[in-house]
């Protein structure tokens, strides 16, 4: 595919540092769609590390089944579309409408072996086409930055799963190519504005330069706090299934485990809550439950925010190292009756979890599944477990965690790795494909964002994503908070019911705190 030779221009400006990126996001982005905030924090100290913000997007790339829609959000983005239109792939059907192009990919042959399937033409190639269309000759970090979401349901393009009802507008993936990016280093207290020009349009070059200066000036202004529109009207938390129904599903799945169909499975349930001030709820969630991965995604069809403890897949192109971070084993934090932390009780709960045979067996099973996932895509002999059975603690729960790493095979890229590993075993079970088939059968509806991944990748090859858990998907003013529990042969259904609510509680409480005064339910 032909390249936009030497058309890439990068404008970088240092700007005023602000310690609260949520307020900065509100100040610069407001309620505009195609904006995104990604944040990282230390697991133990909870200190902010880095915040990356897509302030303006050049294009939006979304997929539903085997159809990919690429929409230009600026004349800058339209330059990329014009190159893609000149170089259509022979096996892809191509349609153009207004400022969008649609690519219809051929259906995958599910009978192919894993090695052939990974190289088959798929919706992931739409990103490769875009990245190849612009030549990054200077190899600048984050110069071509895609931020967004891979949904759980994307897997149905690659595996034979039962059909499910689609009740949300969430696409199979949705990513924005950054036109204006803000990179905040909280350790060094620095802020960098980075704007990317993808074509030769002089007017666009001047507009983007002016926009960069405008953002620089905006960051010199006093930032206004996020409005909190609280109400005293009582609100009822609802769920798609009752505790009894969820317990019944767990028991049915345990019978299949007894028969040997699967070893473990992760059924989930949905909780619903009104939410018309998502950014305020996200701010409350960050305060109460700082996590390694925090995110706020603002799309034309939905808002997604959360604080996830679990990396999905991480890839560093420099050393070709790929990482998985399985989390399995959960307990509530030890608290006194007044809600304050009881350190003695907390440590006893941790000890019980660390020595619980059921939890350890479940965790090690998923570590083994992560090892198997990496074995298919890593150089022989490069895969190993770098951390085994540690404990990470958050506001409402603590988890058993491990880390599995390896060196990606030459000839594969980060998107090959993600497509091969999705969805993560801690959200499906084992064996993975059969567990996902049973999840589709018993849940009966798409999971959407839940259990997929959110994060970023660049044209230099790096990728960093987290599993979309401890999150809220907001559509038409209603938040869906989804949570599950890992079920094995000796699971106690009543405990798994409680675990699903414990996992959702931090997000539920954050939404309530942002919207409702004390005393409302």
Swiss-Prot record:
Transmembrane segments: none
Binding-site positions, chorismate: 329-330, 450, 470, 484-486
InterPro entries from the UniProt entry: ADC_synthase, Anth_synth_I-like, Anth_synth_I_N, Anth_synth_I_TrpE, Chorismate_C
Entry binding sites for L-tryptophan: 40, 292-294
Record entry for activity regulation: Feedback inhibited by tryptophan.
GO molecular function ontology, one term from the record: metal ion binding
Keyword terms of this UniProt record: Amino-acid biosynthesis, Aromatic amino acid biosynthesis, Lyase, Magnesium, Metal-binding, Plasmid, Tryptophan biosynthesis
Binding site for Mg(2+): 362, 499
Reactions it catalyzes: chorismate + L-glutamine = anthranilate + pyruvate + L-glutamate + H(+)
EC number(s) from the headed UniProt entry: 4.1.3.27
Superkingdom classification of source: Bacteria
Listed pathway(s): Amino-acid biosynthesis; L-tryptophan biosynthesis; L-tryptophan from chorismate: step 1/5
Pfam families attached to this UniProt entry: Anth_synt_I_N (PF04715), Chorismate_bind (PF00425)
Note accompanying the cofactor annotation: Binds 1 Mg(2+) ion per subunit.
Cofactor(s) needed for function: Mg(2+)
GO biological process: L-tryptophan biosynthetic process
Keyword DNA damage part of the UniProt annotation: no
Subunit annotation: Heterotetramer consisting of two non-identical subunits: a beta subunit (TrpG) and a large alpha subunit (TrpE).
Function of the protein: Part of a heterotetrameric complex that catalyzes the two-step biosynthesis of anthranilate, an intermediate in the biosynthesis of L-tryptophan. In the first step, the glutamine-binding beta subunit (TrpG) of anthranilate synthase (AS) provides the glutamine amidotransferase activity which generates ammonia as a substrate that, along with chorismate, is used in the second step, catalyzed by the large alpha subunit of AS (TrpE) to produce anthranilate. In the absence of TrpG, TrpE can synthesize anthranilate directly from chorismate and high concentrations of ammonia.
Database matches in NCBIfam families: PRK13564.1, trpE_proteo
Family per record: Belongs to the anthranilate synthase component I family.
Name assigned to this protein: Anthranilate synthase component 1
Source species: Buchnera aphidicola subsp. Acyrthosiphon pisum (strain APS) (Acyrthosiphon pisum symbiotic bacterium)
Source organism phylogeny: Bacteria, Pseudomonadati, Pseudomonadota, Gammaproteobacteria, Enterobacterales
Gene label: trpE
